[in-house]
Curated annotation (Swiss-Prot):
This is Putative large ribosomal subunit protein YmL12. It is found in: Mitochondrion. Putative component of the large subunit of mitochondrial ribosome. The lineage of its organism: Eukaryota, Fungi, Dikarya, Ascomycota, Saccharomycotina. One of its GO terms (cellular component) is ribonucleoprotein complex.
Amino acid sequence: WXDGYFVEVIVRFNP
């Protein structure tokens, strides 16, 4: 993950 791991997780769950 990058620095914004939270953002990456949200993108993964986004359709």
